Amino acid sequence: MDLPYYHGCLTKRECEALLLKGGVDGNFLIRDSESVPGALCLCVSFKKLVYNYRIFREKNGYYRIETEPSTPKTIFPNLEELISKFKTPGQGMVVHLSNPIMRSGFCPGARRLNLEANVYENTDEEYVDVLP
C-alpha cells in the first residue's frame, strides 16, 4: 500500500511543522507512532494545533482508530476507507480531513508498512501444536 500522505518515521515535531505551515484547518497526514510500536498516527491540524489519532491494525488485517469515547468504534478494511470516512464532518474528530499533506520523495517507512500488512498471518496464536 503506497499512500502519498503516509510519511513513515516522521517525528512529531517534523509533522507539526508540515501541518501548521499555511495555518489551514484540516491538513492531515499519516506517520508511524513514536510511542506505540506498530501503530500509526493520523495527524490533523485545527486552530494552530495538531491532533494525533492512533490507528491500530487488528489481527484480521482491518484498521481501527481511536476517536472520542462517545463515537462508536468502527473498523476499516484499508486506510483509504478510514480516511474517506473522516473527510465527512461530524465523525468524531476535532475537524474533518480536508487537505492531505503529500510526502516529497522517498519514504523509508513506506516499505515497512507494506511488509507489515500480513504480520497477523504469522502469529503463533493461530497455530495448533501437533502431537507426535
UniProtKB/Swiss-Prot annotation:
InterPro entries: EAT2_SH2, SH2, SH2_dom_sf
GO BP: any one term: negative regulation of natural killer cell mediated cytotoxicity
SUPFAM superfamilies according to UniProt: SH2 domain
Tissue: Expressed in spleen. Expressed in macrophages, CD8(+) T-Cells and NK cells. Conflictingly found only in NK cells.
Keyword terms of this UniProt record: Adaptive immunity, Cytoplasm, Immunity, Innate immunity, SH2 domain
Pfam family, one: SH2
Residue intervals of the SH2 domain: 5-101
Variant or mutagenesis effect after changing residue 23 to S: In strain: 129Sv
SMART domains per record: SH2 (SM00252)
Gene3D superfamilies, per the entry: SH2 domain
CC per GO annotation: cytoplasm
Intracellular or extracellular location(s): Cytoplasm
Keyword Protein biosynthesis carried by entry: no
Assembly and oligomerization: Interacts with SLAMF1 (phosphorylated). Interacts with CD244. Interacts with Src kinases HCK, LYN, FYN, FGR and LCK (via kinase domains).
Described function: Cytoplasmic adapter regulating receptors of the signaling lymphocytic activation molecule (SLAM) family. In SLAM signaling may cooperate with Sh2d1a/SAP. Plays a role in regulation of effector functions of natural killer (NK) cells by controlling signal transduction through Cd244/2b4. However, conflicting results are reported which may reflect the use of different strain backgrounds. Proposed to act as an inhibitor of Cd244-mediated NK cell function including cytotoxicity and IFN-gamma production, the latter found also by triggering Klra4 and Klrk1 next to Cd244.
Record-given protein name: SH2 domain-containing protein 1B2
Chain's gene name: Sh2d1b2
